[in-house]
């Protein structure tokens, strides 16, 4: 099923028992995060807090708190179907011309989906039913959550930030946390390699001292939200990919105060600019690592206009030690990564980012090993092929007889097939998430690759061990009599 807007999606979730409305008064200060955390950890539903303490606007949390709801948001029934999306992205990343008529016919479904990529611009949109400007702009009237006791201030966590560089035709959508520091001021925390930060950097070089236009959409339709967190090719717009997910063009409308296009059905849109000369100290905040992060200076987003739907819904989340919503998203989107990696490295059988690895910091890869040194090539490929794995600290490579998603299997492979001196690869002075305080320098640290594969001639001078295998005839015989044994 496809959803035109967030409200359609919520109606579907409620019909499936995947959304609960809470009518009791709940405080956005700490209480909503505590309730959301407990609900997510038990695999519970999305939550609509209808009576936030001190506010009139309802708050939506835990929307993508299970892999099933992530898949539903992408128009699929379960996460296994997300591999088909990964195949489509792999095709779009490096399309190959058909080698014959039969192959051309086989590619027609993919090209048909591409027809849904261009967005549709509306002159009148629901997201602009209410328009606030000037002194009417008051961010403190939004029920922005304060998630952890040690957090410095309330935090906008699910805003889709829309930017455009001076030399790019496409607009970029990214999700960056934004600290509330004034009635019309937010701190825009974006890492230097992210699309919004790159657009801003190019703008500053091309337009010194001129304000950089920014719009932030809160509560967009699920396809657009998820497009912003999916590893799409750099040349593809998130709006275009949302159209592919939805099976129909993404509807957008021009912002009131700038030329940026925003999701037409968004619940709330913040419009404004970033002054290249204005920064503020951001944090500390409890983050997806399970720790409070260090403080750092980031640009300040000045909000000049707020537009919204009548009876708008504020969409929010919290981050903390896994599992949290980003970890669940990472677990589901793991299935999207696999076909993209396999297109470049066909020897990869499976690829897994364990949620407890803070979404992306550790990866387990299983391969059909073909030559000595193969595991190291795959390590280097994972670190370099997709920008999403720039910050992955640990890559463990195993043979295809190991289940990448079973820690018992992976640990067995490491302890029996790996010599620490020979089979660990250390790389110094590589990019690391600045939130990773374990690195000696903020933003710069090391990576480790672990080769837990069986060793080939040239990799060892010893005779390699032969794994124990059960006699299939005995296994079959015991299967037949098992129920009679009373065990």
Curated annotation (Swiss-Prot):
Its cofactor is prenylated FMN; Mn(2+). It is found in: Cell membrane. Its EC number is 4.1.1.98. Belongs to the UbiD family. One of its GO terms (cellular component) is cytosol. It comes from Actinobacillus pleuropneumoniae serotype 5b (strain L20). The active site is at 287 (proton donor). Homohexamer. It is a peripheral membrane protein. It comes from the Bacteria. Prenylated FMN binds at residues 175-177, 189-191, 194-195. GO terms for molecular function: 3-octaprenyl-4-hydroxybenzoate carboxy-lyase activity; metal ion binding. SUPFAM superfamilies: FMN-binding split barrel, UbiD C-terminal domain-like. Catalyzes the decarboxylation of 3-octaprenyl-4-hydroxy benzoate to 2-octaprenylphenol, an intermediate step in ubiquinone biosynthesis. Pathway: Cofactor biosynthesis; ubiquinone biosynthesis. InterPro entries: UbiD, UbiD-like_C, UbiD-like_N, UbiD_bacteria, UbiD_Rift_dom. Gene3D superfamilies: Single helix bin, UbiD C-terminal domain-like. This is 3-octaprenyl-4-hydroxybenzoate carboxy-lyase. Keywords: Cell membrane, Decarboxylase, Flavoprotein, FMN, Lyase, Manganese, Membrane, Metal-binding, Ubiquinone biosynthesis.
């Amino acid at each position: 099923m496809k959803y035109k807007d967030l409200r359609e999606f919520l109606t579907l979730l409620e019909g499936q028992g995947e959304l609960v409305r809470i009518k009791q008064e709940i405080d956005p200060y700490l209480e909503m995060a505590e309730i959301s955390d407990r609900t997510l950890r038990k695999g519970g539903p999305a939550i609509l807090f209808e009576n936030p303490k001190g506010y009139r606007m309802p708050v939506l949390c835990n929307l993508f708190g299970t892999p099933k709801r992530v898949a539903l948001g992408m128009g699929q029934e379960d996460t296994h179907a997300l591999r088909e999306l990964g195949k489509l992205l792999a095709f779009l990343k490096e399309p190959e011309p058909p080698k014959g008529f039969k192959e051309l016919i086989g590619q027609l479904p993919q090209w048909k989906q591409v027809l849904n990529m261009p967005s549709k611009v509306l002159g009148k949109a629901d997201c602009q039913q209410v328009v606030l400007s000037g002194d009417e702009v008051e961010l403190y009237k939004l029920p922005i959550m304060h998630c952890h006791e040690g957090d410095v201030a309330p935090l906008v966590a699910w805003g889709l930030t829309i930017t455009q560089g001076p030399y790019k035709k496409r607009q970029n959508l990214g999700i960056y946390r934004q600290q509330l520091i004034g009635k019309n001021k937010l701190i825009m925390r974006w890492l230097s390699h992210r699309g919004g930060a790159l657009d801003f950097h190019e703008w500053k070089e091309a337009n010194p001292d001129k304000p950089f236009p920014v719009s932030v959409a809160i509560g967009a339709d699920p396809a657009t939200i998820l497009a912003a967190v999916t590893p799409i090719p750099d040349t593809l717009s998130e709006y275009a990919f949302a159209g592919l997910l939805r099976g129909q063009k993404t509807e957008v409308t021009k912002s009131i105060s700038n030329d940026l296009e925003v999701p037409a059905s968004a619940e709330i849109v913040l419009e404004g600019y970033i002054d290249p000369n204005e920064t503020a100290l951001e944090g500390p905040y409890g983050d997806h690592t399970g720790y409070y992060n260090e403080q750092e200076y980031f640009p300040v987003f000045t909000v000049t206009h707020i537009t919204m739907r009548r009876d708008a819904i504020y969409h929010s989340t919290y981050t903390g030690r896994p599992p949290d919503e980003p970890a669940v998203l990472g677990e589901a989107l793991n299935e999207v990564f696999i076909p993209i990696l396999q297109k470049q490295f066909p020897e990869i059988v499976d690829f897994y980012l364990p949620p407890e690895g803070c979404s992306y910091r550790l990866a387990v890869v299983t391969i059909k090993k073909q030559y000595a040194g193969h595991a190291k090539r795959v390590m280097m490929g994972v670190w370099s092929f997709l920008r999403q794995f720039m910050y992955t600290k640990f890559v463990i490579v195993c043979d295809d007889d190991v289940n990448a998603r079973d820690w018992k299997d992976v640990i067995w492979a490491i302890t029996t097939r790996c010599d620490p001196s020979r089979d660990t690869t250390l790389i110094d002075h590589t990019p690391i998430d600045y939130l990773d305080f374990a690195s000696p320098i903020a933003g710069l640290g090391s990576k480790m690759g672990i080769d837990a594969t069986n060793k080939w001639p040239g990799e060892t001078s010893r005779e390699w061990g032969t794994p124990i295998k059960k006699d299939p005839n005995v296994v079959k015989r015991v299967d037949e009599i098992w129920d009679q044994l009373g065990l």
